[in-house]
Amino acid sequence: MEKQRLTAQLSSLRVPLFSVPWPGQCSNKAEVIEARMMKWADEHNLLVTDEYRNRVIRTRYGLLAARCYPNAGEELLQAIADCLVWFFLADDLFVDRVEVATDETIRNLTAMVDVLDLNVAGSPPVFGELAWLDVCQRLRRLLQAEAFERFAQGMRLWATTAALQILNHLRPTSVGMREYQTIRRHTSGMNPCTSLADAANKGSVQACEFYDADVQTLVRQTNNIVCWANDIQSLRIEIHQPGQFRNMVTIYAQQGQSLQDAVETTATRVNKEIASFCELADAVTARPISDELHGLIDGLKYWIRGYLDWVVHDTLRYADQFIESDADDRRF
């Protein structure tokens, strides 16, 4: 009933565009990185059918990496691109585009955590586990130990808060906005992504700067901007998913707003968060801070602008013409 009410309002839905006051960047290695990423995904058996391969080709995850980490060294950028294609596919096939919970859900998610904790794959490995192990071992080699642990902790929280997201979808109605924002902050995968922003620019930030309250606020604002914008941009396809579909927009609609009004309310929050991010970023960079921290803040800006540009210019992940074929992965 909830999905039917929302679906009935989709045909007239207007999706806003977002802008930020800094230019976009893109690595000049983008196409090479994309091609290698596809080859890597094929070698690790992530592209389960020709249909699925074609979907990944038009989604352009390598371009997302190139836009969000434009200054990264080629080896690190390749590892990040491979990580992104793995993450999107694992998130779709383990959580989002399948049944809310399956017999394999716990095994799949705990296997991902075990790779981080134990640095080995299980026997037999679950889908994507060997690819994930390969990505993690490359990042362990390329990053300082503490920097890798920031990434790893973000991924552990993705796997564990996925369970909270599943619980929310087993309820007849969604949890409230505060609880949703907590879940979204971690199931998005943004924290491990932003944890790589410093290494991809001027090197890893020392812990005393990385965990500064204002810096962590900037990281959280970056997460919010990307996640809440995505809640609007992915709305049409997510409503058709068999598993996860509740997000900020649908919660506002659950509270009584029309779907269009819920989109506008969410967009207003995105724009306010962008303004707050800009104000705080200017204040932090006006202080005497390290080059590495300057690089991290630049990296957060690259992520915000890079994601927004990827949606507008590169990817067909959320395109209307592929909703019918892409929203439901149970056949895979």
Curated annotation (Swiss-Prot):
Gene3D superfamilies: Farnesyl Diphosphate Synthase. Its EC number is 4.2.3.163, 4.2.3.171. It is an enzyme of class 4 (lyase). Its cofactor is Mg(2+). The keyword Magnesium applies. Substrate binds at R184. Mg(2+) 3 binds at N230, S234, E238. Keywords: Lyase, Magnesium, Metal-binding. Mg(2+) 2 binds at D96. A motif (DDXXXD motif) lies at residues 91-96. It catalyses: (2E,6E)-farnesyl diphosphate + H2O = (+)-corvol ether B + diphosphate; (2E,6E)-farnesyl diphosphate + H2O = (+)-corvol ether A + diphosphate. The record marks F88 as: Plays a critical role in the stabilization of intermediate cation. GO terms for molecular function: metal ion binding; terpene synthase activity. Signal peptide: none annotated. Mg(2+) 1 binds at D91, D96. Terpene synthase that catalyzes the conversion of (2E,6E)-farnesyl diphosphate (FPP) into sesquiterpenes which are important for fungi-environment interactions. Produces a mixture consisting of 8 sesquiterpenes including corvol ethers A and B, as well as traces of epizonarene, gamma-cadinene, delta-cadinene, alpha-cadinene, alpha-cadinol, and an unidentified sesquiterpene. The major product is corvol ether B. The Asp-Asp-Xaa-Xaa-Xaa-Asp (DDXXXD) motif is important for the catalytic activity, presumably through binding to Mg(2+). Belongs to the terpene synthase family. PANTHER family: BETA-PINACENE SYNTHASE-RELATED (PTHR35201:SF4), TERPENE SYNTHASE (PTHR35201). This is Sesquiterpene synthase MBR_10393.
